[in-house]
Each structure stands twice: as C-alpha cells, then as structure tokens.
Design a protein with these regions (language model features):
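Accessory alpha-helical DNA-binding modules that contact the DNA backbone or grooves
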Residues: 2-205
C-alpha cells in the first residue's frame, strides 16, 4: 500500500545557526511578473502572459502523451524550436517548415520528417485530448472528456456561457469561469484550427 507522510514535529534545535526563514517569491524569477497563490493555497503561479518559462511548459504539456501525444516533441526540441523563433504557441507547430526544422542542432532531415509526421498525426486526436492539451486551469482529463462529450466541437464549447457549462456533470462554477476567461482573454491566442483537426470527434465520455 501507499504511505501518506505527515509532519508531526518541527525539530528547530537541529537547524543550522543563521538559518533564514524561507519566503515564497512574490515575483516570477524568469520574467519578473507578479505571482499569485491558487485557490487551494498549495501553489503559486506566474501571471506573466509572455513568460518564457510558461510558454515552454505549455508547449511541452501540449505535446505530452496524455495530451496531443506528439512523439519526438520533448522539452529539448521545444526549447530549440522556441529559441530559433519558429514556435511561440501550439498553433505554430502546425505550420513548421521541415527544411528549417532539419537545420536545428541535433535534428537532421530524418528527425525533422518524423517530427512533422507526428505533428500531422496529432490532428486526428479527439476533442477531449485537445481541450486537455490547452492547459486550461481546472480542466483536467476528466473535465475535458465530459466537456467534449457534451459540446462535440470546439466552436460549440467556445460559445457556451456559464449556465450552460455548469449544467454539465462535474463542471462547477470555478471551472466554467476558467474556461470562459481562457477563451475570451486577449492575451490568449485563438485556438489554431489546424490543431483542432480532431475537433469534430468528441471522444469518450
């Protein structure tokens, strides 16, 4: 079975002399934008829409196995693509030039061809995978599946209001507001229709 750790005592007498109390950062160490604490109080996150670290993390998540499952698009390749100015957001992945990708360090023609083939294959993914891949706060795999089953297409979901969203089983007000804010945010690029190639396939409920 699993063991759940519990802190029962703080042994202050074992602390080294001169220990300074830890303070949570109030600004992102990468982009300098303010950070905020999540509703559960367990996490802090950067609010910078243009934060390079967030951009990399979002792209890696988008390509991950449980999301769009783009084989060969790991952190190192994502970093190379972003560093070369080829990719700023997920939609850019679907407009890559194979010859330019092949010029990247440790890439080559064959690897570039394989990568572009994997990206093309991801267009056939169902809507639930795409929704999870967007990395919208409060929208995990389960929520993505029920939303895809209910609305059936990305356009229908984007047009839904809070009342319609909260009528979906397991979708509460916080998740509904997170979805609406994400789709309406001027800082959030519109979902690329090439990436939404599987948008007509709701996926399993």
């Amino acid at each position: 079975g699993r063991f759940i750790p519990e802190i029962v005592e703080v042994l202050k007498d074992r602390r080294p002399e001169g220990t300074v109390p830890y303070r949570l950062p109030d600004h992102c160490p990468v982009c300098g934008a303010p950070v905020v604490r999540d509703e559960d109080g367990a996490h802090i996150r950067c609010t910078g829409a243009e934060c390079p670290a967030q951009r990399l993390r979002h792209l890696v998540h988008f390509a991950s196995r449980d999301a769009m499952d783009i084989e060969g698009l790991g952190p190192a390749v994502v970093e190379s693509l972003v560093g070369a100015g080829m990719v700023q957001g997920p939609g850019d992945l679907y407009h890559l030039d194979g010859e330019e990708v092949a010029k990247l360090e440790r890439m080559g023609k064959k690897s570039a061809e394989n990568l572009l083939a994997a990206i093309e294959k991801s267009k056939s993914n169902d809507l639930s995978r795409l929704l999870f891949a967007f990395g919208i706060r409060q929208v995990g795999q389960k929520a993505a599946k029920v939303l895809a089953a209910r609305f059936g297409s990305l356009d229908a979901l984007m047009a839904a209001g809070e009342e319609e969203l909260t009528a979906v089983p397991d979708i509460g007000g916080i998740t509904a507001q997170s979805l609406i804010s994400w789709f309406q945010s001027p800082q959030q690029p519109a979902p690329d229709r090439d990436a939404a190639g599987g948008g007509g396939q709701p996926g399993e409920p």
